[in-house]
Amino acid sequence: MARVTYYGTGRRKNAIARVRLVPGEGNITINKRNIEEYFNYETLRRDVRLPLELTETLSQFDVLATVNGGGYTGQAGALRHGIARALLKADDELRPALKKAGYLTRDSRMKERKKYGLKGARRAPQFSKR
């Protein structure tokens, strides 16, 4: 018999996370590594677990995720988004709680591009009056 699997895709900045939720005891595996090995900071680990803790499903599902692109913070945000979307497929009644917490909303803030004539996105070259 095939195992029940729920899929979700999360994005944040340049990071994309493909998340699978499988009934289990709460193990989180990211790119074939444990969450403690993958994220060095507890704040990032907590950020990934937030949707599961909010819906009280942390001990019901194992999370298997593949994430690439971006930095650690972007990847953690992408995982949070992907887990929330997968939880929604598992149980549609979780939508109000996840929506209220803002976990279903894609954070659209992106890095602003560098403009010509400037040192960065907005930083202008030093100005000398004389």
Curated annotation (Swiss-Prot):
Gene3D superfamilies: 3.30.230.10. One of its GO terms (molecular function) is structural constituent of ribosome. Residues 111-130 have a biased composition (Basic residues). InterPro entries: Ribosomal_Su5_D2-typ_SF, Ribosomal_uS9, Ribosomal_uS9_bac/plastid, Ribosomal_uS9_CS, Ribsml_uS5_D2-typ_fold_subgr. GO terms for cellular component: cytosolic small ribosomal subunit. Keywords: Ribonucleoprotein, Ribosomal protein. Residues 109-130 are annotated as: Disordered. Coiled coil: none annotated. One of its GO terms (biological process) is translation. It holds the Pfam family Ribosomal_S9. HAMAP family: Ribosomal_uS9_B. Belongs to the universal ribosomal protein uS9 family. This is Small ribosomal subunit protein uS9. It comes from Alkaliphilus metalliredigens (strain QYMF). The gene is rpsI.
